Amino acid sequence: MIIPWQEIAPETLDNLIREFVLREGTDYGDIEVSLDEKIAQVRTQLQSGQAVIVYSELHETVDIKCHPF
């Protein structure tokens, strides 16, 4: 089930994005990207619709999926 990012409390959204970025790793290619920059990139992807927040009822987990879904 897709959860609109606008319906998530700001602090919860911040924590969700941070956890996603840390879990995905830090290999961004030739250019080093700071944690804050990567968090901002994911937030922008959510706002633009390039990423969505997905809740799995089966596993009772929340994840961020980037395009393509």
Swiss-Prot record:
<dbReference type="InterPro" id="IPR010648">
    <property type="entry name" value="UPF0270"/>
</dbReference>
<comment type="similarity">
    <text>Belongs to the UPF0270 family.</text>
</comment>
<dbReference type="Pfam" id="PF06794">
    <property type="entry name" value="UPF0270"/>
</dbReference>
<protein>
    <recommendedName>
        <fullName>UPF0270 protein VC_2612</fullName>
    </recommendedName>
</protein>
<dbReference type="InterPro" id="IPR036685">
    <property type="entry name" value="YehU-like_sf"/>
</dbReference>
